[in-house]
Structures are given as C-alpha cells and as structure tokens.
C-alpha cells in the first residue's frame, strides 16, 4: 500500500492536541475547510499524540478533515522534530509546520516555525496559485 500523496494536500503538523495554539490552528483550518475544498485541497493535521487523543480532539471540534498520529517518526524524517525549551527545561517536540503538496504530489510550499495568527489565511492565499 502506497503512502504517497498524489493530490493537492495541506499537511500541517501541530505540537499537541487540546493545547491553546493547536486548538486555534485546527479550528482555523476548519473555518476555511470549504474554501480549501473549492481549490481541490485535502487537509490533514498530524501530531505525535496518540490516535485516541487525536480522535477526541477531532470529535470535540467536529473537524471535517483527518488528524493523524505520527507513529513512524515522519516528523524526524522531515526535520521538524526539534529541541525546544520551556521554563529552562529542554525537550523534543514538533516544530509547527505546514506543507502544501501540488496535484502531482510535489512539494509546492513549506512553512516552518509557524505562528498561528494569520497562518491559515496565508496558506489559503498561496493555495490559490498551487497547480
């Protein structure tokens, strides 16, 4: 079974389900779901959370797109599993990132170190020019 993406896709990685920034991000993609759909995009969100936590997250906000759980270290392979620091404590986590894949399955645009505010609006603008 192939895991290749072969259609226009927005694949975004968020650090942790149910946290404030991630909640805003998934809901922004949800609010713009129809606009992305009109541009023929599939939306997929992904984190290192368990499948159960992502199901709860999707159900809580009635998301109309899929959330995936990175159980095979895709984050590491994409270079977005990074060392972070909070309150002086170092740990590894996801660098909030978004990947836009075109209709041929090629990377069209990549965002790293995403700031949630206005991000989805920017992604939507770029999506209008994605083949």
Describe the predicted segments one by one.
Residues 1-131:
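Chalcogenol-based redox active-site neighborhoods
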